[in-house]
């Protein structure tokens, strides 16, 4: 099961916030029961990765650790209990790691240890290291098989561009949780941020009509342009957030009663009125996915119109599998004329983290290639 693994590998190790990253030579991990070792082809870089590791973002995690989060790579070796996963297989390595005996204990690989004692123990003692490395040992269930012939052959996607799926999965988790259907109308708010804009793209690809809310008309126009570049048939309306909840609700109602809302409000905007406006514009029986820091959502329409509110943190494994099916059917534009992927070597990690903070949004992806 471990044939062909080198004795050593290179990894980007964070000793602590003050010392920063260093490239180190580590002993290559061996798979045991319930795990796989993956040869990393590309590791994704998040827009906020730099702030996480600089200590500017209050994410808690143990150190030292290998940085990263998700990745695309080939299985190098598997534990003896693996029945489907095989060496050589292309996989997406997902960052959401859950305790097998307690699904409520979960953390985000190499960026956040979670909030429970169980999740903190699991990260500290078992799955501490991320994917900024030549190899990574990960749970079997976090290796999502990808059809390499279909994706990289028939559809012509590059391995680097496939990393874009890690960004899309977050808003897709909320969209799938409220069971958005083809032809429905969904309000995305706010829509011009990182995950909000990706939520607009996903909903449009799924055949929904999207109403995008944002404070900047210029950014909203650019959002529509970017999404329609990859999906020319996408139906996207825009509504400017004015701060007057009733005025904004009326502006939304111009397009008819909406079926659903995807809310990914950043903490800094948690008291904004846009979520109230969106809820007021829903039809009776409408659904809301709350994926952000919303503290100000109380409106009578929730009760009067039988509105369903569902909180969602990240996504489930089943959601990833369903997303991959859509990806393998060619529903998501990942062509060279749409994708703008920047690739950095492990040695050039600092420039990669800097690029990740600036180069993000629709069709944009930044990766490390160990």
Kindly give the residue locations of the regions a language model identified:
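NAD(P)H dinucleotide-binding glycine-rich loop of Rossmann-like/cofactor-binding domains
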Residues: 98-187
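Glycine-rich cofactor phosphate-binding loops and adjacent beta1-alpha1 units
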Residues: 180, 201-204, 211, 224-308
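Residues in the short beta-alpha loop(s) of Rossmann-like NAD(P)-binding domains
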Residues: 216, 294, 315
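Mid-domain Rossmann-like dinucleotide-binding core that forms the NAD(H)/NADP(H) cofactor-binding site
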Residues: 153-243
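Glycine-rich beta-strand-centered segment in the early N-terminal region that forms part
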Residues: 27-44, 56-107
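Residue-level marker of beta-strand positions
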Residues: 89-90, 135, 185, 205, ...
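C-terminal hydrophobic helical "lid"/dimerization subdomain
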Residues: 2-7, 173, 246, 272-276, ...
């Amino acid at each position: 099961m471990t044939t062909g693994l080198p004795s050593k590998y290179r990894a980007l190790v964070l000793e602590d916030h003050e010392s920063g990253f260093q490239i180190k030579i580590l002993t290559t991990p061996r798979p045991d029961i319930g795990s796989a070792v993956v040869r990393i082809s590309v590791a994704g870089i998040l827009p906020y990765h730099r702030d996480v590791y600089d200590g500017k973002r209050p994410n808690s995690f143990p150190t030292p650790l290998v940085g990263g989060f998700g990745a695309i790579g080939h299985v190098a070796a598997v534990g003896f209990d693996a029945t489907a996963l095989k060496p050589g297989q292309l996989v997406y390595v997902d960052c959401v790691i859950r305790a097998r005996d307690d699904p409520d204990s979960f953390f985000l690989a190499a960026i956040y240890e979670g909030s429970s004692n169980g999740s903190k123990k699991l990260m500290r003692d078992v799955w501490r290291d991320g994917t900024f490395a030549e190899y990574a040992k990960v749970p079997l269930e976090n290796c999502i098989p990808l059809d390499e012939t279909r994706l990289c052959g028939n559809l012509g996607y590059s391995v680097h561009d496939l990393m874009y799926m890690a960004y899309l999965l977050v808003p897709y988790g909320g969209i799938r949780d409220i069971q958005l259907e083809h032809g429905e109308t969904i309000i995305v708010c706010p829509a011009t941020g990182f995950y909000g804009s990706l939520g607009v793209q996903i909903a449009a690809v799924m055949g929904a009509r999207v109403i995008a809310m944002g404070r900047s008309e210029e950014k909203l126009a650019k959002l529509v342009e970017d999404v329609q570049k990859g999906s020319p048939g996408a139906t996207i309306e825009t509504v400017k957030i004015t701060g007057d909840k009733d005025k904004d609700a009326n502006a939304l109602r111009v397009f008819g009663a909406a079926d659903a809302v995807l809310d990914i409000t950043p903490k800094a905007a948690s008291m904004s009125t846009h979520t109230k406006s969106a809820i007021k514009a829903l039809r009776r029986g409408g659904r809301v996915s709350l994926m952000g820091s919303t503290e100000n959502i109380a409106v009578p329409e929730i009760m009067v119109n039988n509105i369903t509110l569902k909180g969602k943190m990240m996504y489930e494994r089943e959601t990833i599998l369903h997303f991959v099916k859509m990806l393998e059917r060619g529903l998501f534009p990942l062509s060279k004329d749409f994708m703008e992927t920047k690739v950095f070597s492990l040695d050039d990690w600092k420039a990669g983290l800097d690029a990740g903070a600036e180069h993000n949004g629709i069709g944009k992806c930044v990766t490390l290639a160990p």
